[in-house]
Amino acid sequence: MYVVLLRLALGLYSVGLLHSILTVIKRKPTFFKPALAAVVAGFACHATSIVLRGMEVQYLPITQRYEAFSFFGALVALGFLIAYSKYRISSLSVFVFPLIFVMTFVAELSYDPSPAIPGILRSNWIYIHIPLIFFGYTALFIAFAAAGLF
């Protein structure tokens, strides 16, 4: 079920990607509100997909390539939604929506149903360390995109 939700999120994120492409080509915002609604719905599907994957494999799903790309894509979506709700900078979406789509697409391409976790990643420390790294990368990218706008 989590794979279906990830594919649904990818489809919804593609609306955001289309918004970004059309905005760059036409040099004016093109259907931002539907794209924002699609990204919100995509994030909900994406987060549910990550939770369901974690429930199935019985560990925090960030250790495999598929899981890491998926988690990072979801965090970037969450980071954008938080930044947008606070600052209302819609032009940030031109940079963020393509990254969300690409990360989710790469996660979909590298999907591996094997729940086997490498031995080196069985430490409890990894469950604190890796999410903090991804939060840092997300904050760095959002700040980079915002700085690039100004």
Language model features by range: what are they?
Residues 1-150:
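Polytopic transmembrane helical bundles with strong interfacial aromatic enrichment
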